[in-house]
């Protein structure tokens, strides 16, 4: 039996450059999980800078070797040859993807990256679903091809419409482009007119699974689900996601009809899905006739509870409903679901993954359908993400400890340490002798699971501050932006292979299906902008709203973009229809709308309450300007130092004396920028660095800037 792979194969390596050997035209790389590779640059290697949707190819081939500096994170795709010494492998790189123009820069941390991405996503789906520019949802189709074309079926599913409405509403919030809100409003009305049922007898609201459009005036209602896992039942998650788009739209408009629909659907959850016994939680399915979760007609869904029925309320609609209203009832609902998750889902004596499916008494259901005793990697990450959000609303040790535990376990259990990215469904436990959790079907990676990782580690870093969380957030965002964006056609790929190449076969080929609509990609872009700008790079964030007359209760527009760490964000400025407006509570994050206002457009600029770097020009003494620098000096914060330097030069400084007593870190890019300042100003221009910590002083000395400046 062959004991080693004795053939060539192509694959991807993700990692950090540790050195470049010019004589061998090769560089060394260390992966996220600490494994070393030697990478030879093949004769035809080409390199590119990661690009956003809507951007052209950014060729970096000519500068490639100068870019291979220690610390830079990149992707190398190439060929392994079993020709090395003692049977080792040699790796020839064919394609290099660079994540930023300098070694410590990540392009997706630019303040406008996610905003431009959501803009492109919005336009892609508008063109795909409404090519004539008229937002008539009778023309909407669930299934879209990889090119964005409508496929044959005239089936319209409530959840996929709602998810797309969520996307359009989020695109409006980040861009202020009215067409996105018009599409969201039209979709919300269509859902209400064609899918909503108000049961006056039982005082609840529920939503049809789908309709089949027969012609312009005729359709066939599909009440119970016809999706295989949920056939002839009313799944809780479908009722949950029917609210996703309308509630996100409600955050913008305050339309009372949306709030009434949400309240009616919540009564459905509390009346029929909720287990009112001492066991608690929410059942996953109802019988479509009796609304009984224990009905034998439900088969393998009889009296079951799962992650979706308990955990999906929060991200799909409930957090957004609380953000828009501030209603304590919704905060209590959130607390109930997260307390249930924290109590029932951990199973760490048996697996690094949570248990996701249960019987009514919370005993484990490990024989259900496709899931068996398997883990969905993204659900674990989703729990960590949303627990952290909830911790910011109602802090509990149990929320923080479980979120941190998941964050610590998942990289080894669910991520790809060599190539980057996150896997899909794996076996929860290892068999004797196994080191790797076995894949349920394949080692492909789904777009939505990357989203969960990015958002989880971003908010974990923004809330608790651990640098390792930012590392994983950046690596996850790098994989998504490098490999999931269809920069040729638009939209994002459903799945990529383990090596990042698109997988376009079967139901995973298209850009729209029962499983994919405008939700996760838009949610990632929206919250990616929120978390990155306000919590990581500490930059302003702009949001737009269009309140309806008589909409928001007491005329209060709540503008908090998410449940962020308390006191971390404030309102900097507000305009209404382009004119400055001062009636707002900066720290309370709400705007008091004008009494009896009509149709208005509100623009709000949010800023972090603490910034990552301060650089203050303190005047000139003996021709030397004084600039005090505090915080983290990185590519994302260099603009503050540049502003202070510009002020000093404008004041006629013949040199600059930098006070670095408050500086906690200094990137190589910052040192090089100061060297270029010295070069451009000439030999008579003096530089002094005072008060630097030993670590900062070591950075300065190692860069040889001490040859050009006085380092005190």
What are these regions (language model features)?
Residues 27, 613, 625, 656, ...:
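Conserved beta-strand core positions
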Residues 306, 616-619, 679:
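Short secondary-structure boundary/capping segments
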Residues 2-609:
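Glycan-recognition and catalytic cores of secretory/periplasmic carbohydrate-active enzymes
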Residues 609-628:
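Short beta-strand/loop segment at the start of cytosolic alpha/beta domains
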Residues 161, 380, 624, 653-655, ...:
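A general structural motif
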